[in-house]
Amino acid sequence: MLFRSQYIAKQLAAFKSGERKNPIMQGMVANLTPEDMKSIGAYYFAQRPKASAIARDATLAGKGQKIYRAGIAELKIPACAGCHGGAGAGIPAAYPRLAGQWPEYALTQLKAYASGERKNAQMNAITARMRESDMLAVVEYMAGMRAR
C-alpha cells in the first residue's frame, strides 16, 4: 500500500506547487504538509474500489478495448495496459487505476495531457497523437472496467 499511496501524495504535491492546476484542489492542499499528503494517499489507497461508472455505449467501448489492450500502431500509440495494467488497476507509485473511472473526468485529463496543461512527458507524447474519437473510445472502455 505504501507505494500505491505515493501516487496520490505526488498528485497532491503537484497541486500545491502549481505544477498541476485546479483552483479548487490548490485551495484544498494549500496547508497540507508532506506528511498530511502521505496520510491522505494511504487512506484513499486503503479503500476498496467501487463500481463508479459504467460503459454506456458497447460499440464505442469495444473500440476503446482494442486501443487499451493493443494501442494504435499506425499512430504510434502504445497500449494503455502496458503501464496501467490489463485490468486497469494501475501500477503502484507510478500509474493510476483507470478501471471504473468516470468518462468525463478521464477525457478531461487526456485532453489536459494532449494540450500540455498537465505535465507528464510520456502521456503528453501519447495523447498528442490521439484523435478525440480515440480518447472517447478508450474512456468509455475504462468506465466499464472493474479493477481486481
Regions picked out by a protein language model, each given a short descriptive name:
Residues 6-7, 13, 17-23, 56, ...:
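Extended intrinsically disordered, low-complexity coil regions enriched in Ser, Thr, Gly, Ala
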Residues 30-52, 63, 104, 109, ...:
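C-terminal capping alpha-helices of c-type cytochrome domains
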